Amino acid sequence: GKCGDRGETIKTVFAATMDASRALQHKMMDGGADLRKEITAALQDGPIAVAPGECIACAGVEGAYASIAGARLFPGVPIKYYKYFENVFEAVDKGEARYGIIPVENSTAGSVHESYDLIMKYRFFMVGARDEKIEHCLAAHPDTRYEDVESIYSHHQALTQCSNFIENFGFTGITYSNTAAAAKYVAQSDRRDIAAICSPTAAKKYGLQVMKREIQNISNNRTRFVVISKDMQISSDADKISLIFRVPHTTGSLYRVLGRFSMAGLNLTKIESRPMGNGEFSYFFYVDIMGSVRRDVTLDLLCALSDELPGFKFLGNFREQED
């Protein structure tokens, strides 16, 4: 057109201006009122806490990485163990546990899609998080010799995180429900040609000998665990926001949404697409942002997006702990 090379730039600026104008109109018309009400009611004066007599839930058995993260997030709080991630959600849903601790992302293996799928299925919220350094070791029965080991049992994420070690030494990786459960299985088995990939904590707990330490592909191997809750709670020190949404099938629609976060002064720390699984090329986006809903600009934007974007879900605003 007449604008020449600058046409696209002008179009982008114009679109952004229109979006900003729409957001302002949206607030004046009390848009996103339901989300605003829900978020306002969830604001707390202090950190999230577990009442006396309540417990938290995680998958696996004692020594599982989730239980290590849980014990650091909620010191001294009893932990109930369940076999699978979904059992953790069921426990929280039924009130058997106040919160659940589940992994959502690993620095080597990526997002734990099952966790996000379950958060959507149960319509739960993230109310806390912890970024945990994961140190895997190879552990076996005290009577097992290293040269006799052929098969290694562990959770599929742990096998992925230690794939170089497994391939280099010609081991066969066998998927098990959980790293600590794999350690327990190896400890109780009569076989002397198997080992487990687990935490040093789990190896010690089940009386296994540690044959090799730090066998993960990347030395700084980290997993993010989130605290899941049936109801929305936003602690006073919350600094991270998680969202899921879809965008319309129009050119630049995702770019425009991301531009609005930028205009609101929000820093994206994660964006990931996930097929919706309906046979069409439709995608959900997981987005993490540094920020707090206590800031008006942030809350206004989330309320506007909740009305505009299909499949929008505010997953929570929480504090993330690190080592």
Place the predicted regions along the sequence by residue:
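Domain-level signature for soluble enzymes in the chorismate/prephenate branch of the shikimate pathway
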Residues: 1-323
